[in-house]
């Protein structure tokens, strides 16, 4: 089968790999779409994230959906059914799984995170517990976007937003735009967004932001010097942590969902202490796919419009470059290994 491989920094090629064979109760999925995520860009530009280094050639891709290849009545699945796939397969037995923190499982098998190959291929085998059937009216894009939406839902669980709080969203990429919509839905009095990219700022306004600017310094002006009760950071900027702290009110909360370039932040620690901030970092997601599906099905979150570009498998390199350079209106690019189930 065909697959997209990262061979090195900014070196993406399409090639062949052995067709997957299912073992045990696994299900074979024909991949319908794979999102290019910010973490994929870190593998592409830096060869890894922190201590997680890829061993080239590496198949990326963890945001994906596809069609079931055969009837599996014992699982309630039928051939040709569109399903979303949770990339995480936690062990279910460790201390952290036992506490309900499956997203922190140290034994997790995570599709598309080293050393485990991802879904930018034509066919993949996954465990039944990773599969979430979607309503018949769902598009492939909506099914794929359940993964980044799930991360945003998990972030909001950590945030514990209260009604009529002021919220700042830093970074209006796919996860930032999902966070913005969730904050609005949760009853924020004002939602302010910050992004230096014009078309992302326009998307933020369209999806519910009250005000948007390229600089976080406008938040001080908009809030009369108070800052925001809740700051949702979703950038790749090493300055993102400091900007979030600057934007937060005394006693506020900061939720860090972004991954910085170079895997390092710079921070004025005294400012954090003096403001008495509560800071939480987002690690993937818990068991949130069912809620994410309900949100999209009910029209509570628009994920369809976040997907701006589609590329066939052999043009994955173009998608990576487009997202890296943030041009041509690219917010979320989708790699489409095949247009239809056959």
State where each predicted segment sits.
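C-terminal hydrophobic helical "lid"/dimerization subdomain
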Residues: 1, 242-246, 286, 290-342
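N-terminal glycine-rich cofactor-binding segment
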Residues: 5-21, 38-70, 84, 105-115
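Glycine-rich beta-strand-centered segment in the early N-terminal region that forms part
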Residues: 20-34, 49-95, 130, 135-137
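Mid-domain Rossmann-like dinucleotide-binding core that forms the NAD(H)/NADP(H) cofactor-binding site
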Residues: 78-80, 138-217
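NAD(P)H dinucleotide-binding glycine-rich loop of Rossmann-like/cofactor-binding domains
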Residues: 91-170
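Glycine-rich cofactor phosphate-binding loops and adjacent beta1-alpha1 units
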Residues: 159, 202, 206-278, 341-342
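Residues in the short beta-alpha loop(s) of Rossmann-like NAD(P)-binding domains
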Residues: 196-197, 260, 285
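Rossmann-fold dehydrogenase core element
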Residues: 253-255, 266-305
